[in-house]
Amino acid sequence: MSRSSKKGPFVDPKLIKKIRMLNETGEKKIIKTWSRASTIVPEMVGHTIAVYNGMKHIPVYITENMVGHKLGEFSFTRRFGGHTNKSAKKGEVKK
């Protein structure tokens, strides 16, 4: 079930406060955040936000196409090691 439209999108209050301060001053600075659940709003476009993935902060440059998505969608929490070869599964030695 999606969020009620009368509530509006969720954005961490501290994060939106930092974005508004940077918009007023015109500064382009990387903002660290742990709020992966925050929705990207049009005010954030053009800023770089470092989103925590559980291990480190991943810098994400916000574009217009990202508006409406969550910050956590752009900072992956798992590493994909790749699929194993069929020969490795059977225990054969590849020559």
UniProtKB/Swiss-Prot annotation:
Q: Which PROSITE patterns does the entry link to? A: RIBOSOMAL_S19
Gene that encodes it: rpsS
**Which UniProt key words apply to this protein?**
Ribonucleoprotein, Ribosomal protein, RNA-binding, rRNA-binding
The record describes the protein's role as: Protein S19 forms a complex with S13 that binds strongly to the 16S ribosomal RNA.
Q: What is the lineage of its organism?
A: Bacteria, Thermotogati, Thermotogota, Thermotogae, Thermotogales
Question: Quick one: a GO biological-process term for this protein?
Answer: ribosomal small subunit assembly
Q: Mention any one GO cellular component term assigned to this protein in its UniProt record.
A: small ribosomal subunit
MF-aspect GO terms: rRNA binding; structural constituent of ribosome
Know the name of this protein? Small ribosomal subunit protein uS19
Lineage, top-rank taxon, reads: Bacteria
Q: Which family does it belong to?
A: Belongs to the universal ribosomal protein uS19 family.
